UniProtKB/Swiss-Prot annotation:
PANTHER family associated with the record: SPLICING FACTOR 3A SUBUNIT 2
Gene3D superfamilies: 2.60.40.2690
GO cellular component: catalytic step 2 spliceosome; nucleus; spliceosomal complex; U2 snRNP; U2-type precatalytic spliceosome; U2-type prespliceosome
Complexes and interactors: Component of splicing factor SF3A which associates with the splicing factor SF3B and a 12S RNA unit to form the mature 17S U2 small nuclear ribonucleoprotein complex (17S U2 snRNP). Identified in the spliceosome 'E' complex, a precursor of the spliceosome 'A' complex. Identified in the spliceosome 'A' and 'B' complexes. Identified in the spliceosome 'C' complex.
Pfam family, one: zf-met
Keyword Metal-binding: yes
Matrin-type Zn finger ranges: 50-80
Subcellular location: Nucleus
Official protein name in the record: Splicing factor 3A subunit 2
Organism: Dictyostelium discoideum
Family: Belongs to the SF3A2 family.
GO molecular-function term, one example from the UniProt record: zinc ion binding
One annotated GO biological process: spliceosomal complex assembly
Function, as annotated: Involved in pre-mRNA splicing as a component of the splicing factor SF3A complex that contributes to the assembly of the 17S U2 snRNP, and the subsequent assembly of the pre-spliceosome 'E' complex and the pre-catalytic spliceosome 'A' complex. Involved in pre-mRNA splicing as a component of pre-catalytic spliceosome 'B' complexes, including the Bact complex.
Amino acid sequence: MSEYGKAGSGGLQSSQYDNIDRRERQKQLVLEHVDVSKDPYIISNHIGSFECRLCLTVHNNVGNYLAHTQGKKHQTHLARRAAKEQRENPSVSKNNYIQTTRVIHKKTIKIGRPGYKIIKQRDSKTGQLSLLFQIDYPEIESGLQPRHRIMSAFEQRVEQPNKDYQYLLFAAEPYETIAFKIPNKEIDRTTGPDGKFFTHWDRNKTFTLQLYFKE
């Protein structure tokens, strides 16, 4: 697991359509990678909203719920729940987690980790820290696009949880999923021409993701 180390122009109408399309692609990537049906804390109520059983909060849609799961309140409750379960059942180890992931991916023969490059920058105007990830997937399966997900330190079972960090995961068959350890700070998810969150999948089979942390 590694620690971390706007382009274009055009008419207003074209820019607006590009902005909408990009937001939809980002939303779809998240929904494809995160199976909320396996989340023990989400329930749908009688008015079509979604509730978090862990934090007793209500959310208008799945996207809002997923954003909530990355927040401080949910992460704090997860940490407390994990500590309680560890005390009550100390025999559960990370080996169980590893076995589970192997079963999930047993139909695909992994070919190793993809190559990658990370660029660390700061916005000259706002002072915000930026991380740019470029992941190469030359042998990605036909018709697929890479997926990404941000995971809290208390969801993973590879390292001892540290509340100061979170993990950015990239996945694409038949490559192994790779994870980067990044600061546990709120990510600026503004989009659009001046947005601070950007993803791109190009014809050279390089997946690019750039994010900024809020100050």
